[in-house]
Amino acid sequence: MKEQISAELTHLTESENTTVFGYELLRGFLIPEILGKDTPEILYWAGKKLARKYPVETQEEIIDFFTQASWGDLEIKNETKDELEFELTSPLMVSRVKSKAEHFFQLEAGFLAQQIEHQKGVVAEAFEHPVKKLQKVQFTVKWDRKDKIE
């Protein structure tokens, strides 16, 4: 029985690696190749579009979405009256941040901006801050409470 479980887990791990490899091929090579210099801006707006398609009502649900999308472990670090700071970690982040190739986290930034905009009812904008030494990405989402969504 233990051997069967071990074999299933090994197969699952190989499957996950294939999925990760395919995902990274698309994200790290193909998309930037197609979009060129506009990659960060288009990924940001794509993230906003994803958030509109999959709106969530709480910050906890945002965190759950990141986990389900295999984007990594999202954590809220700080919140003020007009700003929210997140931190994202995952094995993929480690490999992306370590690599010398240019990587963007604008898909995630756009997603965060739109979800916070939806939840707070004000226009929001997000900024990514890769921290290579710590192998993670920090996001700052800012909003103006006077700039309400109509």
Question: Language-model segments: which ranges?
Answer:
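N-terminal accessory segment detector
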Residues: 1-92, 96-103, 145-150
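Short terminal or interdomain "cap/linker" segment that borders an active site or interface and mediates
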Residues: 78, 86, 123-150
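Long, amphipathic alpha-helical coupling/dimerization segments that relay conformational signals between
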Residues: 98-126
